[in-house]
Structures are given as structure tokens and as C-alpha cells.
Swiss-Prot record:
Keyword Cell cycle: no
Record keywords: Hydrolase
Summary of the function given for this chain in its UniProt record: Catalyzes the hydrolysis of the N-glycosidic bond of diverse pyrimidine and purine nucleotide 5'-monophosphates, to form ribose 5-phosphate and the corresponding free base. Can use AMP, GMP, IMP, CMP, dTMP and UMP as substrates. Cannot catalyze the reverse reactions. Is required for optimal growth in glucose minimal medium, possibly because it contributes to nucleoside pool homeostasis by degrading excess nucleotides and feeding back the ribose moiety to catabolism.
Gene that encodes the chain: ppnN
Cellular-component GO terms for this entry: cytosol; protein-containing complex
Species, as recorded: Escherichia coli (strain K12)
EC numbers for this chain: 3.2.2.-, 3.2.2.10, 3.2.2.4
Name under which the protein is recorded: Pyrimidine/purine nucleotide 5'-monophosphate nucleosidase
Length: 454
């Protein structure tokens, strides 16, 4: 099957040089990146969390960029049949395909165009933040003048039905209060709040629904965008993805999840516990149904015993009360607005949030890097939080990212070393994730990609 797709969404014009950049060549990493992300988009809504399995299932899929005088078209060769209805591509997928093209081309151009950006230094914290801003601005995700109303929702892709229905109820309550949603774009706790908010917005006749899906090339195939996403944004790596979340958020809700959710919480606490951010207003709520109370108790104990009692003041745990979660978020929006106005910061992008370089620099989850993490208590808590975040990030890679899966197949499990008490609590937390099926989607046995060494 070969079909041609016209542009829809936020990109409809490419220069001739940009098209040539994406022309298929056997050695083109850029083409492979574009192809794999496009395939993930066309599998939107599919229940998989194994990027290697998805990519191998569609080995005969190809995509070409065709240059036309009036713009550009995409040629799809052997695409997934589920992306089409009566021979026509689903419009949301059509828009998301061009979002992939937009973001991958833009990031490549920003990084490699030394004429337009001669001084871009990706080892410089300020430059990294400006790149994150540029990607979001190019995606038209930063709406000037809009009052704060963007709630970022984090949580696992592999959650049980009770947790899914609860996250949907929270989303409905947020939607009834005309709040918009940003998630990691995949299934589970990333889809449920959007689904609930869509109903809430419809009930209120709210016409400006924004369901932002923020992803990255290395995970999009393991977590294909859910069908509710109407603004897909692809950040270059997990660190820039996390920074984008935090800088566009006016409030953050964390639902039950696995190692990826723990990584997100530790990343955020590493920022909020930095003394430079003591005046920031960013409400953070951890919530789930009553069946998840034990999950949050264990997570809370892990945070307190590794980062100290002071970490607790940066978040609130609300169990089994969807309306209260939404009320607290809505009540916080004027406070966020006042804080941004008082500091002269933008409503759409939090420039004043201080993010330490060790939270911004990409972490390569190699076996050597994982073994060399400094997981000891005799250091500033924000530094320990950053290394704990890296440890969980490596486990995410070993679980679902193609590069991590291949490394585990070749060299065996990651070995994680550190303080005996921290290692014991980390092992308890991870064993709980395994027992509760939070590492993999139900139906597939989980084989640990790590060993805790004490």
C-alpha cells in the first residue's frame, strides 16, 4: 500500500534544502529517526510498551518527503491499516505526522545550523533552556496573554482499571474547571486525564481544549500517542522533555506509576528543593484511588528517607478525592499568575525556575554510567535527587527504550551501587513496582534490567 498525505496542522512549508535533508539515504540517522517516530504516531492508541517489537513488526514501512512547488507531501509505504478509515488517514494522525516532521527538522536545524546559531552550546545551562523555549515556540505551544491553566499530569503507562478510572475522574473535574492538560502523550495515566477533561470541556462548552502530548524519539515507539492528543511535541531527549514539562506547567498532578513516574518526581523535587527556587509557586499533588494509598505511602517514605523530611513540604498527597484535587489546582491558578506577574515572568513559560546543570545534561544509561552513580547521603539533597533520577531513568531505558533493551541483551542487567540503606529502600520500591505490574503492560512477564548491589 502506498499513499500520499498532505500537510495538516502547524507545518505546511519546507525549504528545498530541508526536504533534501530528509531524503532517504542508507546512512541517514535523521531519516531513521523521522521514520521511527512517524511509525509510532501511525500506531497511536496501540497497546504496546516495547519499541523493539513495534519497529520489527513494521520493518517494511517506509516514509518519504516529496517536494512540491506548493509545499510538501509525505509518501507512506505499507503504513499500519488502523491509521486509515475507508482509505483516508485519520486527521489527528495526519496532523501528528507533520508535528514529527516539524520538531525533528527544527531541532536538527537548531543544533547543526552553525550559520544561524553560531554560539549554541548544549553544555551551557542557559543555551539548553533557550533551545527548549525555541522548540515550544516553533510548535506554537506558547500562547501569549493566556491566564495560567495548564496542568501537567504524570503517571504510569501500565496502571490498573481502578487507577485509570480515577485519573479519568480527576481529568473530568479539571475539565469542568476549564483547565487544560499536558501529559507524556502515551496510554494509561497519560491518556485518562485527557479523556476525562475532554468530557468536562464538552459539558462546559469550552472551545479551547488543549491536550499537549510531550514525548521524545527514544520512547515514542514504546508509548505511542494516545488518540486525545491534539498538540504533539517531540523533545530531543528525556532531560529537555522534563524541562519543557516544568517550564510550561502551572500545576502538576502525579498519578500512580512505575520507575518513569518516580524519575519525574525526583527530577521535580531536585528543582523545588534548590534554594534558588524557594519563591516559586508550582502546586504539586500526588493522587490516586484508595487502592493506591499504599503505593503513595511507600513512595513518600522513600522520598523522606533519601531526601529528608523537608521534601514533604513541596507536595501534597490526596487520596480518592478527584474533586478536591481539581479544586486545589483551580485555586492555585491566581497564585501562579500573581507570582509570575510579581517576578516579571511569562505566564506561558517559566523562565525564572532555576534548573541545575546536572538535571539538564543528557544522561547516557550505559552500564558504566549506571554503576558510577553517587547514591550516597553525604551531599546536597538536590544533587542526590539528580543522581537518583538518573538511576530511575536508566531503568526506564532498560525496560522500554530500544537503546537500553539492546544494551541489556548484550551486557546483562545494570548494576546499581550506593549507600546500603538507600539501596535497601530503592530495592523495596522497585520490587513493589514489579509486584504491582507497573514495569510492563499486563500480559508480558517482567525480567528485571537491573541489580541492586549493596
Amino acid at each position: 500500500m502506498i499513499t500520499h498525505i498532505s500537510p495538516l496542522g502547524s507545518m505546511d512549508m519546507l525549504s528545498q534544502l530541508e526536504v533534501d535533508m530528509l531524503k532517504r539515504t542508507a546512512s541517514s540517522d535523521l531519516y531513521q529517526l523521522f521514520r521511527n517516530c512517524s511509525l509510532a504516531v501511525l500506531n497511536s492508541g496501540s497497546l504496546t510498551d516495547n519499541s523493539k517489537e513495534l519497529l520489527s513488526r513494521f520493518e517494511n514501512f517506509d516514509i518519504n518527503v516529496l517536494r512540491r512547488e506548493r509545499g510538501v507531501k509525505l509518501e507512506l509505504i505499507n503504513p499500519p491499516e488502523e491509521a486509515f478509515v475507508d482509505g483516508r488517514i485519520i486527521r489527528a494522525l495526519q496532523a501528528n505526522l507533520f508535528a514529527v516532521l516539524r520538531d525533528i527538522l527544527f531541532v536538527y536545524g537548531q543544533i547543526h545550523n552553525t550559520v544561524r546559531f553560531p554560539n549554541l552550546n548544549l553544555d551551557n545551562s542557559v543555551h539548553i533552556t533557550n533551545l527548549v523555549f525555541s522548540i515550544l515556540r516553533n510548535a506554537r505551544a506558547l500562547h501569549v496573554g493566556e491566564a495560567p491553566n495548564m496542568v501537567v499530569c504524570w503517571g504510569g503507562h501500565s496502571i490498573n482499571e481502578n487507577e485509570y478510572l480515577y485519573a479519568r475522574r480527576v481529568g473530568n473535574q479539571l475539565g469542568l474547571r476549564e483547565l487544560n492538560i499536558c501529559t507524556g502523550c502515551g496510554p494509561g495515566a497519560m491518556e485518562a486525564p485527557m479523556k476525562g477533561a475532554a468530557v468536562g470541556h464538552a459539558q462546559q462548552r469550552y472551545k479551547d481544549s488543549r491536550f499537549i502530548g510531550m514525548t521524545e524519539p527514544s520512547i515514542i515507539a514504546a508509548e505511542p500517542p494516545n488518540p486525545l492528543v491534539n498538540e504533539l511535541i517531540i523533545m530531543p531527549d528525556i532531560e529537555k522533555r522534563l524541562e519543557a514539562f516544568v517550564r510550561i506547567a502551572h500545576g502538576i498532578i502525579i498519578f500512580p506509576g512505575g520507575v518513569g513516574t518516580a524519575e519525574e518526581l525526583l527530577y521535580l523535587l531536585g528543582i523545588l528543593m534548590n534554594p534558588a527556587n524557594k519563591d516559586q509557586v508550582l502546586p504539586l499533588i500526588l493522587t490516586g484511588p484508595k487502592e493506591s494509598a499504599d503505593y503513595f505511602r511507600v513512595l513518600d517514605e522513600f522520598v523522606v528517607h533519601t531526601l529528608g523530611e523537608n521534601a514533604r513540604r513541596h507536595y501534597r498527597i490526596i487520596i480518592d478525592d478527584a474533586a478536591e484535587v481539581a479544586r486545589q489546582m483551580k485555586k492555585s491558578m491566581p497564585l501562579v499568575k500573581e507570582n509570575r506577574r510579581d517576578t516579571g515572568d511569562a505566564y506561558s513559560f517559566n523562565w525564572s525556575m532555576r534548573i541545575a546543570p546536572d538535571l539538564q545534561m543528557p544522561f547516557e544509561p550505559s552500564h558504566e554510567n549506571m554503576a558510577n552513580l553517587k547514591l550516597y547521603p553525604d551531599q546536597p539533597v538536590e544533587v542526590l535527587a539528580a543522581d537518583l533520577r538518573r538511576a530511575f531513568s536508566g531503568i526506564v531505558a532498560g525496560n522500554v527504550k530500544e537503546v537500553g533493551i539492546r544494551a541489556i541483551e548484550e551486557f546483562g542487567p545494570y548494576k546499581i551501587n550506593g549507600d546500603k540503606e538507600i539501596m535497601r529502600r530503592m530495592d523495596d520500591l522497585l520490587q513493589g513496582f514489579v509486584a504491582q505490574h507497573r514495569m510492563k503492560l499486563p500480559g508480558s512477564a517482567y525480567i528485571p534490567c537491573y541489580e541492586i548491589c549493596t
